[in-house]
Amino acid sequence: MGVISFYLIGQLLYLIRKKYTTTYRQQQQHQYNMDSKHSTSSSSSGSLATRISNSGPISIAAYCLSSILMTVTNKYVLSGFSFNLNFFLLAVQSIVCIVTIGSLKSLNIITYRQFNKDEAKKWSPIAFLLVAMIYTSSKALQYLSIPVYTIFKNLTIILIAYGEVIWFGGKVTTMALSSFLLMVLSSVIAYYGDNAAVKSHDDAFALYLGYFWMLTNCFASAAFVLIMRKRIKLTNFKDFDTMYYNNLLSIPILLICSFIFEDWSSANVSLNFPADNRVTTITAMILSGASSVGISYCSAWCVRVTSSTTYSMVGALNKLPIALSGLIFFEAAVNFWSVSSIFVGFGAGLVYAVAKQKQQKEQSQQLPTTK
């Protein structure tokens, strides 16, 4: 009996071990199959994400849409009934920008350097110029239509080009000069188109006030770009480093200016954010801030997957849909002069882009000389 009992116990242990081994192998096979499916799915989704990330047309479309979104949302807020908290609007946009790029950095999508006091001191003059540029831009957009604003913005290119000649030894080619003449012509045509739509003395006053802010913005923008170019050489900032410091340092300046120069009485706040469209206005303010990040990100994306040449052409072509968006979403003047100015300005941008490409090509073909 002892032998039989020992034999039966041995058989039982053998069966248990066999059952456990079979079950374990089945579980391992099931896990392997699941991993294979997951790997295939991940590979497929990863492949799709890679295709999108490396798609030139998608990057170009994203850049154009982000540009239009920012312009339209800014115009929506600024054209609201008696909106006068421009500094506050710009502060909100800068805060949203900092939060957005901080979130993107935490997700390892973008990277930028940590805050440094010495670099902040070197960069602080740029922050003041940025505030001057974006404030005058907001005032110009408040009084001018999007097409006219977009056309007159081209004049900044002329100031920057001749600023580069003076400060950096740049050169203005014959083709570039031709594009400048077209830019001036488009601005003159836009002026006639705007004047044709004037119906009252108040409209004329608002129009000329818009031109004043636009002219101021052109000089402020040119000064910002030229001086920032010098500072970038000192600090060796990349795109998102520049965005980080620009927005971070401008926030306190904008908030202080808002609290000092703007009316924060309950009546004025209610006037700027009426109950009927308060949520829509705040949403537009947040979207305009986020879209500024989108423009910078899509700019870098477009250059990476296409070329700087393609990007410069896209920048020129992009002025047409931005100008047309003003005709579609807002009551901009639509007449022969206004429509003609859009296409002349569009042509000027194309000629300038081609001129810059030819100039860069000639410079790259020049062999370095040594004494």
Curated annotation (Swiss-Prot):
GO MF term list: antiporter activity; GDP-mannose transmembrane transporter activity
Glycosylation sites: 268
GO biological process: GDP-mannose transmembrane transport; hyphal growth; protein N-linked glycosylation via asparagine
Keyword list, A-Z: Cytoplasmic vesicle, Endoplasmic reticulum, Glycoprotein, Golgi apparatus, Membrane, Sugar transport, Transmembrane, Transmembrane helix, Transport
Segments traversing the membrane: 52-72, 81-101, 122-138, 146-162, 172-192, 207-227, 242-262, 282-302, 310-329, 333-355
Major localization listed first in the record, in broad terms: Golgi
Listed GO CC annotations: cytoplasmic vesicle membrane; endoplasmic reticulum membrane; Golgi apparatus; Golgi membrane
Membrane topology classification: Multi-pass membrane protein
Cytoplasmic topology ranges: 1-51, 102-121, 163-171, 228-241, 303-309, 356-371
Compartments reported by the entry: Golgi apparatus membrane; Cytoplasmic vesicle membrane; Endoplasmic reticulum membrane
Residue intervals on the Lumenal side: 73-80, 139-145, 193-206, 263-281, 330-332
Transmembrane helix in keyword set: yes
Similarity comment: family membership: Belongs to the TPT transporter family. SLC35D subfamily.
Task of the protein: Involved in the import of GDP-mannose from the cytoplasm into the Golgi lumen. Involved in hyphal formation.
Assembly and interaction partners: Homooligomer.
Protein name from the UniProt record: GDP-mannose transporter
Organism, as annotated: Candida albicans (strain SC5314 / ATCC MYA-2876) (Yeast)
Lineage: Eukaryota, Fungi, Dikarya, Ascomycota, Saccharomycotina
